[in-house]
Amino acid sequence: MARNKIALIGSGMIGGTLAHLAGLKELGDIVLFDIADGIPQGKGLDIAQSSPVEGFDATLTGASDYAAIEGADVCIVTAGVPRKPGMSRDDLLGINLKVMEQVGAGIKKYAPNAFVICITNPLDAMVWALQKFSGLPKNKVVGMAGVLDSSRFRLFLAQEFNVSVQDITAFVLGGHGDTMVPLARYSTVAGIPLTDLVQMGWVTKERLEEIIQRTRDGGAEIVGLLKTGSAYYAPAASAIEMAEAYLKDKKRVLPCAAHLSGQYGVKDMYVGVPTVIGAGGVERIIEIDLNKGEKEAFDKSVGAVAGLCEACIGIAPSLKQ
């Protein structure tokens, strides 16, 4: 039986980490693509040379021609410019929109049956544009955001309570930006809701709000520390979790930027919501009940994403279709 084929479009820090993780998990053969010739080939060769030590079997190749991604089962898109200190994700819009147009054309031509995971920022607007540029089915194009944001929330909670990260569940909804909505009411420690833990004296409401704000600022905190780039280990791990759910038909319940067609009162936009990911791509969108405050925060986040999509249309009017 032929191995799955995974195309990594963009071979920067996230792309290289994706290739390593996909190899370690033996998810399939891996193609690293980048317009900067030599970088994908070099990283592919370097990671391949680690396979005898780490004990995985996968073919890794690098390319600067989209023809190399032909027939890919999964495409993970990281191409574009990363954030630098003082920049918001939204500052990247104009540059990365042009990149998405090129990437969309490449995927449409060579990998039209792939499950596509977009990581490029500003995430919600870029995945929306990528789906339109590529013409792929909406359930086969998703954005990686919620898994990462929820992972950050889970880590901070585990550190606060001094418990294992494995015992924390957390949900973050909305756009991947300053308006994201970490949902304390739907987050638990070993099944115990955070709201109950406040009543039990484990944490104050004020401290919990500080953790929620740190989650919102999670990416910016790392950008500020690195000074020359943005996060790559956790984003790569998050995207690999999504790819694995698709390739192995795991039916994982994962928050991601999915296309909404009326759910949560949102139409023709990509926003972070809980989904079921299996062999059919996004097989289901889970609509959870939101209280008044949560709904207001979610709607504010949706409004921010809508503004970015409108800005995209201003740059590329063809997206209005």
Swiss-Prot record:
Residues where NAD(+) binds: 10-15, 34, 96, 119-121
Keyword ATP-binding included in the entry's annotation: no
GO biological process, alphabetically ordered: lactate metabolic process; tricarboxylic acid cycle
Class of this enzyme: oxidoreductase
The keyword Oxidoreductase belongs to this UniProt entry's keyword annotation: yes
Keywords on record: NAD, Oxidoreductase, Tricarboxylic acid cycle
Residues of the signal peptide: none
Gene3D superfamilies listed in its UniProt record: Lactate dehydrogenase/glycoside hydrolase, family 4, C-terminal (3.90.110.10), NAD(P)-binding Rossmann-like Domain (3.40.50.720)
Database matches in InterPro entries: L-lactate/malate_DH (IPR001557), Lactate/malate_DH_C (IPR022383), Lactate/malate_DH_N (IPR001236), Lactate_DH/Glyco_Ohase_4_C (IPR015955), Malate_DH_type3 (IPR011275), NAD(P)-bd_dom_sf (IPR036291)
Alphabetized Pfam families for the sequence: Ldh_1_C, Ldh_1_N
Organism domain of life: Bacteria
Catalytic reactions of this protein: (S)-malate + NAD(+) = oxaloacetate + NADH + H(+)
EC number: 1.1.1.37
Binding site for substrate: 83, 89, 121, 152
GO MF annotation list: L-lactate dehydrogenase activity; L-malate dehydrogenase (NAD+) activity
Active-site positions on this chain: 176 (proton acceptor)
CDD domains cross-referenced by the UniProt entry: LDH-like_MDH
UniProt similarity note: Belongs to the LDH/MDH superfamily. MDH type 3 family.
Biological function: Catalyzes the reversible oxidation of malate to oxaloacetate.
Name of the molecule in the record: Malate dehydrogenase
Organism annotation: Sinorhizobium fredii (strain NBRC 101917 / NGR234)
